[in-house]
């Protein structure tokens, strides 16, 4: 299968091999170049467990509760337990929705579950039977949960500036929709087959998850495509094309931007700082959902990196992506 030029001589295929139930699946990638399946499997596994984005509750405001150490009459769980239960609610948002408030209001006794949330179009609660609280006697119980799209497990993801109302409680959000990943490699003689076991929380399809992991990994290594050996032919450090300032190759995803700002830029296909600096203020303000607050945040990020808007860079994307 391999030749001296190390070129692939086959058309690879990715498919769902088996649905194991309980949001567990086997995804098959084949054929894979001999010796590459373990490398590919490890890369997919690490990206799936660390870098996919998803929706999660980031803060909650419970009626008649001032802080997380409060207790409620006729409620079995304390507030800490209620917040912990809210963290486990699996929420699926349609593309274009990156933040919203969910309301829950009941007057009953018994278990209050995720299915009691009032949802709107574009919002789906996957695990409707997830318990939130247990009411030992009939009583009113209501809360407002703020849901946001993010990446990675964020420690108290609702930063202090977002705790605007009295009684707002931050939730240690778990954005990653992937719960477990394993892989197995099968030798086919002149090629290999990679099988990836993926367990999700139900908010993402397995093929989409693996594909997104591959896309994200490719984005991260694409900045090295333009690396070249020095023209003097000496071994040692590999240099980036001298026409590009290395700071301009920094991915937007690596900046400390809010979810809204990051999503707006991503929707505009702004991948690197080098893409961003070529925009003017007026051009950025025309991007849907990007307001003055996001603009000021972006300008501060550029200042922190000794950059500014309105810079012209000829053929930047072509140089970066080797086109």
From Swiss-Prot:
<dbReference type="GO" id="GO:0006351">
    <property type="term" value="P:DNA-templated transcription"/>
</dbReference>
<protein>
    <recommendedName>
        <fullName>DNA-directed RNA polymerase subunit alpha 1</fullName>
        <ecNumber>2.7.7.6</ecNumber>
    </recommendedName>
</protein>
<comment type="function">
    <text>DNA-dependent RNA polymerase catalyzes the transcription of DNA into RNA using the four ribonucleoside triphosphates as substrates.</text>
</comment>
<dbReference type="Pfam" id="PF01193">
    <property type="entry name" value="RNA_pol_L"/>
</dbReference>
<dbReference type="Pfam" id="PF01000">
    <property type="entry name" value="RNA_pol_A_bac"/>
</dbReference>
<keyword id="KW-0240">DNA-directed RNA polymerase</keyword>
<dbReference type="GO" id="GO:0005737">
    <property type="term" value="C:cytoplasm"/>
</dbReference>
<comment type="similarity">
    <text>Belongs to the RNA polymerase alpha chain family.</text>
</comment>
<dbReference type="InterPro" id="IPR011260">
    <property type="entry name" value="RNAP_asu_C"/>
</dbReference>
<dbReference type="InterPro" id="IPR036603">
    <property type="entry name" value="RBP11-like"/>
</dbReference>
<dbReference type="GO" id="GO:0046983">
    <property type="term" value="F:protein dimerization activity"/>
</dbReference>
<keyword id="KW-0548">Nucleotidyltransferase</keyword>
<keyword id="KW-0804">Transcription</keyword>
<dbReference type="InterPro" id="IPR011773">
    <property type="entry name" value="DNA-dir_RpoA"/>
</dbReference>
<feature type="region of interest" description="Alpha N-terminal domain (alpha-NTD)">
    <location>
        <begin position="1"/>
        <end position="228"/>
    </location>
</feature>
<keyword id="KW-0808">Transferase</keyword>
<dbReference type="Pfam" id="PF03118">
    <property type="entry name" value="RNA_pol_A_CTD"/>
</dbReference>
<comment type="subunit">
    <text>Homodimer. The RNAP catalytic core consists of 2 alpha, 1 beta, 1 beta' and 1 omega subunit. When a sigma factor is associated with the core the holoenzyme is formed, which can initiate transcription.</text>
</comment>
<feature type="region of interest" description="Alpha C-terminal domain (alpha-CTD)">
    <location>
        <begin position="244"/>
        <end position="323"/>
    </location>
</feature>
<dbReference type="InterPro" id="IPR011263">
    <property type="entry name" value="DNA-dir_RNA_pol_RpoA/D/Rpb3"/>
</dbReference>
<dbReference type="GO" id="GO:0003677">
    <property type="term" value="F:DNA binding"/>
</dbReference>
<dbReference type="InterPro" id="IPR011262">
    <property type="entry name" value="DNA-dir_RNA_pol_insert"/>
</dbReference>
<dbReference type="GO" id="GO:0003899">
    <property type="term" value="F:DNA-directed RNA polymerase activity"/>
</dbReference>
<dbReference type="GO" id="GO:0000428">
    <property type="term" value="C:DNA-directed RNA polymerase complex"/>
</dbReference>
<dbReference type="InterPro" id="IPR036643">
    <property type="entry name" value="RNApol_insert_sf"/>
</dbReference>
